């Protein structure tokens, strides 16, 4: 009778510990759907404009002191005005400006959990603040609601990216935030890289590119979420407390 009561209490303790570890595991919250219609970001400018504006400036390719491919005014990939990674103007990616090496900020500590996730999902891109580059995808088949844009996309889809930049899903509270960030950095990087090669993008290009990249970012989020949960389940299953309790309980049953 005593052994029976002890066995019951051990079983209860085992279940409680297992549940506690599972509840304490940090998981990203599922977000709302993306194809619910309407603007994702109210307060946008021109009709049919961009849904993913960069912070602190005009829309993609807008005439803020210099349009696409212009030599002055801070356009994308330009030699003056503080463009991306440019030697003039300061503020570019990876530029030190007037700061000396003595004032360099300390390097951020590497999160080993993120490194493990990156090894399974994609390579970390240097100089992009921890963003990873996903594997190549087939460009999605999208209907834009009018014949002109549908035809334009079919004829120019090769000009749009087939990989996306993203951060680990556990850094975001929901899918919407992940996709928004993913679209912004992917469109920006692709635009800068392509513009420096001498190819310009029209407003139609940017609009279509955002839609295409949005679908790819949603797919990337789904892949990363599934992989994240699988890694989390493995950690919970083989973490020390549940394993020790399970072994102890089995030994008690065998001996008893």
Swiss-Prot record:
Cu(2+) 1 binds at residues 64-66. Gene3D superfamilies: Prion/Doppel protein, beta-ribbon domain. It is a lipid-anchor; GPI-anchor. GO terms for biological process: protein homooligomerization. SMART domains: PRP. Cu(2+) 2 binds at residues 72-74. Changing residue 142 to M: Appears to be associated with differing disease incubation periods in goats experimentally infected with isolates of bovine spongiform encephalopathy or sheep scrapie. Residues 234-256 form a propeptide. Glycans are attached at residues 184, 200. Residues 25-233 are annotated as: Interaction with GRB2, ERI3 and SYN1. GO terms for cellular component: Golgi apparatus; plasma membrane; side of membrane. Residues 28-110 are annotated as: Disordered. Cu(2+) 3 binds at residues 80-82. Keywords: Amyloid, Cell membrane, Copper, Disulfide bond, Glycoprotein, Golgi apparatus, GPI-anchor, Lipoprotein, Membrane, Metal-binding, Prion, Repeat, Signal, Zinc. Residues 55-97 have a biased composition (Gly residues). Disulfide bonds join 182-217. Residues 54-95 are annotated as: 5 X 8 AA tandem repeats of P-H-G-G-G-W-G-Q. It holds the Pfam family Prion_bPrPp. GO terms for molecular function: copper ion binding. Cu(2+) 4 binds at residues 88, 90-91. Monomer and homodimer. Has a tendency to aggregate into amyloid fibrils containing a cross-beta spine, formed by a steric zipper of superposed beta-strands. Soluble oligomers may represent an intermediate stage on the path to fibril formation. Copper binding may promote oligomerization. Interacts with GRB2, APP, ERI3/PRNPIP and SYN1. Mislocalized cytosolically exposed PrP interacts with MGRN1; this interaction alters MGRN1 subcellular location and causes lysosomal enlargement. Interacts with KIAA1191. The normal, monomeric form has a mainly alpha-helical structure. The disease-associated, protease-resistant form forms amyloid fibrils containing a cross-beta spine, formed by a steric zipper of superposed beta-strands. Disease mutations may favor intermolecular contacts via short beta strands, and may thereby trigger oligomerization. Belongs to the prion family. It is linked to Polymorphism at position 142 may be related to the alleles of scrapie incubation-control (SIC) gene in this species. This is Major prion protein. It comes from Capra hircus (Goat).
């Amino acid at each position: 009778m005593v052994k029976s009561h002890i066995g019951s209490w051990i079983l209860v303790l085992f279940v409680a510990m297992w549940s506690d570890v599972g509840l304490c595991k940090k998981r990203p919250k599922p977000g709302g759907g993306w194809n619910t219609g309407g603007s994702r970001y109210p307060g946008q400018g021109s009709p049919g404009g961009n849904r993913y504006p960069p912070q602190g400036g005009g829309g993609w390719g807008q005439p803020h002191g210099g349009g696409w491919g212009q030599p002055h005014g801070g356009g994308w990939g330009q030699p003056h005005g503080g463009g991306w990674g440019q030697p003039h103007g300061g503020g570019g990616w990876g530029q030190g400006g007037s700061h000396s090496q003595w004032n360099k900020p300390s390097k951020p500590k590497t999160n080993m959990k993120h490194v493990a996730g990156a090894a399974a999902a994609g390579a970390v891109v240097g100089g992009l603040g921890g963003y990873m580059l996903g594997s190549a995808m087939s460009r999605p088949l999208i209907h834009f609601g009018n014949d002109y844009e549908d035809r334009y996309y079919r004829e120019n889809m090769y000009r749009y990216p087939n990989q996306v930049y993203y951060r680990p899903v556990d850094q975001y509270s929901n899918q919407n935030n992940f996709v928004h960030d993913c679209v912004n950095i992917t469109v920006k990087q692709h635009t800068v890289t392509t513009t420096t090669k001498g190819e310009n993008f029209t407003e139609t290009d940017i609009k279509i590119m955002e839609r295409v990249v949005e679908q790819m970012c949603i797919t990337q989020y789904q892949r990363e979420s599934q992989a994240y949960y699988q890694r989390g389940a493995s950690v919970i299953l083989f973490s020390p407390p549940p394993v020790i309790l399970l072994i102890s309980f089995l030994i008690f049953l065998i001996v008893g």
